[in-house]
Amino acid sequence: MHGPLAPAPSPERLGAAPARQRSDGRIRLRVGPARPGGGTRILDLAEAGPSRLRFPRGTCALEAVLVNTAGGVACGDSFAIDLALEPGADLVLTTTAAEKIYRSDGPVSRIANTLTLGEGAGLAWLPQETILFDRARVRRRFEADLADGAALIAAEVVAFGRAARGERIVDGLFADSWRIRRGGRLAYADSVLLEGPISDHLARPAIGGGARACATILDVSPGAEARLEEARARLAEAASPGTTAAASAWNGHLAVRALGDAVGPLRGLVARFLAGYRALPMPRVWQS
């Protein structure tokens, strides 16, 4: 005699794809001056998911190195940084390696960076490059609120495939939004949207002229607009074959745009320019 038969699995259950593991990385960091003229110290730090911060010793200023232990971003992952500098604090933020945005079968990954700088605070936002692979889909948001006397220098380098391997972005999504406010007023806004055959879009003369990598450098600091001629001279010194760059200044800030046939030469241009413009060496991880 047999017991009751178990119901047959439904076709939906038989063909169901396993649930994906989504990465959800979060960093919250608040820093402030240790004492008048005595450097900067960590006041609050919270880490979640695969996001970690490391603080190398022996650096001139407090330096935070962002680590993504997941090894990259893909398929609907979410990462966020909430960074606050109290009045008078100084910080350099970078990443341990290039951030890789891997292919997705549909879900869009999201990266949100939110910065708050008090009066007299100074932040150098210097992550290493971001590399997009074919069919990557990502939306990034960069928002900063600065007191009138705060100083922000931010640099971002993005590679659309690895030129040395002949990679192309046949289909993908790259949406990048920058909003920076000074004293509560919007000082800088920029949005980039590349969707579909990104490499083909970049091949158009009016968009990228065949570039495979781009960079943005922004200086929102007191006196930045007056440094335009210096910036142009330093760009000329930093240039290398396969790169092109230009600087402009308005509304109290200075912006640099650069393009490269490959990310390596463009990264070199950015590093040389920033080292001269800031009169400080790049973070050590940039040299590894």
Curated annotation (Swiss-Prot):
Localization per Swiss-Prot or TrEMBL: Cytoplasm
GO cellular component, one term: cytoplasm
GO molecular function per UniProt: nickel cation binding
Keyword Chaperone in record: yes
Major location category of this protein: cytoplasm
Domain of life: Bacteria
Family from the record: Belongs to the UreD family.
Chain's role: Required for maturation of urease via the functional incorporation of the urease nickel metallocenter.
Name of the protein in question: Urease accessory protein UreD 1
Organism of derivation: Methylobacterium radiotolerans (strain ATCC 27329 / DSM 1819 / JCM 2831 / NBRC 15690 / NCIMB 10815 / 0-1)
